[in-house]
Amino acid sequence: MNKEIISTPNAPAAIGPYSQAVKTGLVVFLSGQIGLDPATKEIVGGDFAAQVRQAFKNLEAVARASGGSLANAVKFTLFLTDLARFTEANAIMAEVVPQPFPARSTIGVASLPRGAQFEVEAILVL
C-alpha cells in the first residue's frame, strides 16, 4: 500500500501522534479538526458556532493540501459535547459544505481535546 502523509500550516498541527491526513490512491482520510486557530493554537471564541466554523475551515485547509476540497467528501463524522446543539451544527454544515451532501454520522461525546465543543473528521475521494 502506498500512503502519503498530508500536512499544511493552514490548519493546526496535530496535537498527538497522528497526521493531519493520509492519502492512499484517490482516498484521503482526514483526522478530526476542532475549532483551533492555526496561528494561536487556541480554541476560537467561547461560542459553539465559531468553533464549528473554524473546525470546518481547518478541515477544508487539510482537504486542499491533499488536492481536494470539502466537495470531495464522501463521509463526515461529527462529534458534539452537547447533542442539543445538533440543529445548530446542521445549519452551519449546510452553509459551508456544498451539495450533494456526503454520508454522515453524528456522535455525542463527554468531552473533546482542549475543551472543544465540536470536532469533525472526513473521508474524501478525489
Give each language-model segment a name:
Residues 2-126:
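Short, polar/acidic, helix-capping and beta-turn segments at strand->helix junctions
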